[in-house]
Amino acid sequence: MSSSSSSLAAAAARKRALTEQRFSELSPALSPEVVKALKGGGFRRCTPVQAAAIPLLLSHKDVAVDAATGSGKTLAFVVPVVEILRRRPSPPKPHEVLGIIISPTRELSSQIYNVAQPFFATLKGVSSMLLVGGFDIKAELKKLEEEGANILVGTPGKLFDVMERLDTLNYKNLEILILDEADRLLDLGFQKQITSIISKLPKLRRTGLFSATQTEAVKELAKAGLRNPVRVEVKTEVKPTGKDGAQQELGPSKTPLGLRLEYMICEASNKSSQLVDFLVQNNGKKIMVYFATCACVDYWAIVLPLLDSLKGSPIIPYHGKMKQGPREKALASFSALSSGILVCTDVAARGLDIPHVDLIVQYDPPQDPNVFIHRAGRTARYDQEGDAIVFLLPKEDTYVEFLKRRGVPLTERECSTNAVDIVPQIRSAALEDRNVMEKGLTAFVSFVRAYKEHHCSYIFSWKDLEIGRLGMEYGLLQIPSMPEVKHHSLSLEGFTPVKDVDVTKIKYKDKAREKQRQKTLKRKAEELALRPEIEKRRKAPEKPEKPKRKKTGKQRQAVQTKEDMDELANEYRLLKKLKRGVIDEDEYEKLTGFGESDDDDSSDGGDSDLDERKERGNKVLKKIKQKGKAKGSRRFEGRSKQKTRRR
């Protein structure tokens, strides 16, 4: 992937990645113990971000650091934390928390904790604890309650939980708070937890906010959590190498020095074949391949090892839906390899410091364009060189110009003319194993739906997706029935379905799974056969209606009396309104029915009828009052009897 001229450029970049400033020459000076620990880890000279941030934090300043991924941010805050705690006049009490480091993911928190251990070990009488998800919270709370901790490293969710549940830890004398990958913390929705954590800490502290991108949300967080912060912005001047080996002046770049970025444009039906050819060309390297979804990772993690050209290559899946144990094991396994392939999602895009990664492949461009830089930054870290490539469809070519305008220049790489078509091999595997077929369908559907949610929808328009060619890329036997295909005129051009195949008869290679599937199919068939009988039972014959019994004379009289009383009560209410002047006599007549008559001459008797109605209303009033008095007297008598009984 690199020529002799590009190798020379990368070598020059490695030299520029470090400053001439040595850790031993920083001012304020570092302690001999920390300098020794740095030398033990192979760190003698500072990166630009370390040279800028460490002295500021040690000089009682708050800092907001904006630096490219892979620039050495971790040591830029671990060293100040250790030095600040070392300078305290007396050793801390067991439950006195003096330093907190917050990062967005379990993996990043664990990585920071492991990097910091040699430095924490130089502090006498100071204990530390890692607080991340996936572990028994009760056991952690018990340990904290019994032993305490002076430095806490963890994720915001877990730290918030601990602070809410446990009141034995003392934060009043906290010296320093670090927020690492601040933009990612906010993207993941931790704003509420971070605000709550900060509210429980003393204002007279030092705070470091470290981020690869300065978003508006990060700036707002800096205003809320930092006091007069010093802004540290570290950018690198990059001169990427073109096809002819000449260097192009492009000014400041957000990518690490020593990183070569390329892109390849190919049809969807040829994309998976180009990927495999590219992996074969770079056999023996340590490679990370990024996919859009967890389902895509699961699918390609089982398909790639089945291909003839990649048999024997270690291929490890890694995504956010894996359980904590397998995730940690996968990461540890890949980190220990000298060569191999990690197929992953964006959960591995930030913060992870995997050693000696040679090549980054972005098979699916990220939904968020900011993540592009973080993915590429897994290689070319510190003083190393590395390569990264992104695969694009023909209609996505404007993404190249978009990245260039954001300070991420790319050079084109032509499609290989020798790439072997892998679709027949994938389809053959799907016909032999139902697991491959099902995972392919799930991955295909998940990719289409993820594509719909792309932040750059004007470049990655899902309505322009060529579903037919995409189906060939995934080696599908048939295009699945899904709303995106059913209700929209997406192109099925380029797809050749496998004929004369009954997909319901494809079996699992795993005998136990197939046995369970057959049991399920048998049970469903039995349920289907019984359904008509069940439906028949449900539709029981309707019971004949009981003949209605005639009401007795008393019942009829009671109904009539109630109706009369209701009518009289209504008239009385209207009469009261008339007396108060709420309504006039015409309205009263209309509402009581006196204004309605078929004969014009009937109006002559209106006055006498009105007087009669008023008299009836007064009688109703008298009856209602009498009833009220009777009820009141009965209540009084009841209370008197109760008092008599008590006596």
From Swiss-Prot:
A motif (DEAD box) lies at residues 180-183. PROSITE patterns: DEAD_ATP_HELICASE (PS00039), HELICASE_ATP_BIND_1 (PS51192), HELICASE_CTER (PS51194), Q_MOTIF (PS51195). It catalyses: ATP + H2O = ADP + phosphate + H(+). Residues 54-232 form the Helicase ATP-binding domain. Residues 619-633 have a biased composition (Basic residues). It comes from Oryza sativa subsp. japonica. Interacts with BRI1. This is DEAD-box ATP-dependent RNA helicase 18. The Q motif is unique to and characteristic of the DEAD box family of RNA helicases and controls ATP binding and hydrolysis. A motif (Q motif) lies at residues 23-51. Residues 596-610 have a biased composition (Acidic residues). The lineage of its organism: Eukaryota, Viridiplantae, Streptophyta, Embryophyta, Tracheophyta. Residues 512-545 have a biased composition (Basic and acidic residues). Pfam families: CTE_SPB4 (PF13959), DEAD (PF00270), Helicase_C (PF00271).
